């Protein structure tokens, strides 16, 4: 089953993306480099719980 997750910017801007992840095949926390439009550069986004 795919669960919804929130990818939060590590730049401290408060920007986030939402996506889904298969917890059976990827049990660890997800870290992806994506574009932060507030900081206007690519930064690391870390997985947090979607409330």
From Swiss-Prot:
Give the UniProt keywords, A-Z: Ribonucleoprotein, Ribosomal protein
Q: Which GO terms describe its biological process?
A: translation
Chain spans, region Disordered: 1-21
Identification of the protein by name: Large ribosomal subunit protein bL33
Q: Which domain of life is it from?
A: Bacteria
Q: Which organism is it from?
A: Neisseria meningitidis serogroup B (strain ATCC BAA-335 / MC58)
Q: Where is the composition biased (Polar residues)?
A: 10-20
Against Gene3D superfamilies, the record matches this protein to: Ribosomal protein L33
Sorted alphabetically, which Pfam families does this protein's record hold?
Ribosomal_L33
